[in-house]
Each structure stands twice: as structure tokens, then as C-alpha cells.
Amino acid sequence: MSKYKLIMLRHGEGAWNKENRFCSWVDQKLNSEGMEEARNCGKQLKALNFEFDLVFTSVLNRSIHTAWLILEELGQEWVPVESSWRLNERHYGALIGLNREQMALNHGEEQVRLWRRSYNITPPPIEESHPYYHEIYNDRRYKVCDVPLDQLPRSESLKDVLERLLPYWNERIAPEVLRGKTVLISAHGNSSRALLKHLEGISDEDIINITLPTGVPILLELDENLRAVGPHQFLGDQEAIQAAIKKVEDQGKVKQAKK
């Protein structure tokens, strides 16, 4: 029986989403389409009369800005927002900045699918020579984390994402939900997938089939033990949402040349 409701989402579209590049921990901002997605998400939640008590985001701009735009549409700008690196996107290591379609051409679509969607396959780690290494690890936000800088990931599988996310869920977010607070989590594709895996009990094998579009609110109904009582629900125009899911799934495929 449903006792609690949780809303989560993947942030709105950013420039590198549109360019089909692995963004990961690079602090790309929302583009105009992403801002519109966030505003539409806020309108959708307003139409359903959601009133939030707390918002949780990653420390990346696109996650935080999405939350701000949603709260603005709701007229709930005063709601506290808390940010943690533990909700960050998956660290894609050496793949950061690379184009997914080009990677599919170089390594095959199945390898790219495994890097993007599988549970326990880790991409090659980022090295100091990587063009975005210093931009990430010299950033002040990572010098005030709850772990030392040298213990932050250099690459992650989805399993790794879940392992660094769970302590934050268990110690910070879950207690607020259990107190009856209405919580919004504005995160990323893979941190959201990892949390869905945990709450819904999705198997290691089946998680590869879970795809989340940008800027679409997801409703989870939870029991007294904070386990999902049914599958997650995308809120909004279902036909448009399915088209958006397919768009994400196709990012790691080689487009057919026009005749």
C-alpha cells in the first residue's frame, strides 16, 4: 500500500546533451530547450498540486538550475534546496567529452550501450592528461565534499554510482520522506536510474533497459519501508515522453547515411 510519494527527474537538456557528448562531471549549463523542459516540468507538477518541502540536487549547475526553474513555476522559490556530489551524474572517466555516435563507430554500438546502460561495467578512468581533468578536480565544489579529493571517482559503473549515492539517500533523503515531507530530487540520468534500481528492486540485468528522458517528472509511490509499490510513472504527455526516451536510446547508435 502506498504511503509516501517521491518526485525525481533527470535535469533539462544541456548543450552537450544536444551535441550527443558524454557530459558527466563537466559543469555544462542548460540550453534554451532544457530551460523550457524544466519550466514545463514545473507546470506539470503545479497542475497536479504538488507542494514541496525539500529539494535535493547534485552540485552540477544543470541539476540545480532545473530545480530553480521548477520551483519558480510552482511559486515555491522559498523551498530549501540542498546539493550533494553524491547525486552527481555517473563519472564516465576517459569518455567525458566524446561524441556517443562517434564512439559507436569506433567501438561498436553494443560496447557503447554497455558503457552507458549496464550495471557493473566501468569505462576507462580519466587521466591527468585528459582535457577536462583539471577543470573537474580543481573545482572548489569538490574540495568541500564529505570525502577527500583523492577519493573522488575517476570513473564509475552504475553500481559505483549506487554505492556512493545510497549513504546520502539513507542518511539524508529517506529520513525526510519518512517524516512525511514531500521531496523533489533533481538529478541526472544515471544517479536517477541507480536510485530507481534500489527503490524498485530492478535486477542488474534489467536496469540496462531503463532509460530516462530529460526534464520529465517521475512519480514513485513508496510503502512504509520506502520500497516502490509499483513501477515508476512518467508524468505528462505519454506519446511525447516515449519519443523522448527513444531519442535518448538512439544517442549511442550510428545514424544511417541518407541515400
Swiss-Prot record:
Species the sequence originates in: Macaca fascicularis
Keyword set includes Cell membrane: no
Feature type site, description Transition state stabilizer: H188
Binding site for substrate: 10-17, 23-24, 62, 89-92, 100, 116-117, 189-190
Catalytic site positions: H11 (tele-phosphohistidine intermediate), E89 (proton donor/acceptor)
SUPFAM superfamilies: Phosphoglycerate mutase-like
Record keywords, A-Z: Acetylation, Glycolysis, Hydrolase, Isomerase, Phosphoprotein
Gene3D superfamilies: Phosphoglycerate mutase-like
Function: Plays a major role in regulating hemoglobin oxygen affinity by controlling the levels of its allosteric effector 2,3-bisphosphoglycerate (2,3-BPG). Also exhibits mutase (EC 5.4.2.11) activity.
Name of the top EC class for this enzyme: isomerase
Activity control: At alkaline pH BPGM favors the synthase reaction; however, at lower pH the phosphatase reaction is dominant. Inhibited by citrate.
Phosphothreonine modification, residue list: T122
InterPro entries: His_Pase_superF_clade-1, His_PPase_superfam, PG/BPGM_mutase_AS, Phosphogly_mut1
N-acetylserine: modified positions: S2
GO molecular function: bisphosphoglycerate mutase activity; hydrolase activity; phosphoglycerate mutase activity
Superkingdom: Eukaryota
Complexes and interactors: Homodimer.
Entry's family note: Belongs to the phosphoglycerate mutase family. BPG-dependent PGAM subfamily.
Catalytic activity entry: (2R)-3-phospho-glyceroyl phosphate = (2R)-2,3-bisphosphoglycerate + H(+); (2R)-2-phosphoglycerate = (2R)-3-phosphoglycerate
Keyword Zinc part of the UniProt annotation: no
Protein name, as recorded: Bisphosphoglycerate mutase
